[in-house]
């Protein structure tokens, strides 16, 4: 369900996760999948993703053009600042905001961590990670 319209103006965006799974908004990579619920064409100023990371995955990431906030809803892991070696545990109820474009490593330690992620500026939906782990 893409949203409600009045004379061509979007008045409310309603989207179910089940509509995103398996669609062009569902991106997958080695050890992760991102169900991209809100994207740039929704004109909300950020994108909103329901992301799953497979237990045992170690993702090397660096978003040079985006800021990211992550809220953990299931599983456990940790985020490592590659430059400083600082480590922060991630578990349900913990938010981690990557506000300096830092190189990071995300490790999925227990279960498949589920994260609600917001990116600004918003992603268009067709991005894939480059060699540096960014978009």
PLM regions and their residue ranges:
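Short, conserved beta-strand element in jelly-roll/cupin
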Residues: 50-53, 64-79
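Short beta-strand His + acidic residue motifs that chelate non-heme Fe in jelly-roll/DSBH
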Residues: 59-61, 79-80, 98, 103-110
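A short, N-terminal "cap"/entry segment at the start of jelly-roll beta-barrel domains
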Residues: 1-45, 128-135
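Short acidic-glycine-tyrosine-enriched beta hairpin
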Residues: 84-100
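A short hydrophobic beta-strand segment most commonly corresponding to one strand
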Residues: 69, 97, 111-127
């Amino acid at each position: 369900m893409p949203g409600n319209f009045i004379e061509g103006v979007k008045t409310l965006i309603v989207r179910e996760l089940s509509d995103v799974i398996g669609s062009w908004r569902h991106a997958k990579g080695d050890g992760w999948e991102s169900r991209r619920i809100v994207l740039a064409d929704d004109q909300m100023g950020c994108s909103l993703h329901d992301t799953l990371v497979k237990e045992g995955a170690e993702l090397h990431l660096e978003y040079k053009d985006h800021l990211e906030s992550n809220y953990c809803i299931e599983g456990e892991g940790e985020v490592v600042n590659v430059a400083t070696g600082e480590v922060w545990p991630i578990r349900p109820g913990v938010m981690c905001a990557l506000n300096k474009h830092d190189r990071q490593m995300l490790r999925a330690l227990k279960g498949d961590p589920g994260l609600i992620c917001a990116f600004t500026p918003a992603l268009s939906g067709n991005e894939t990670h480059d060699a540096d782990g960014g978009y």
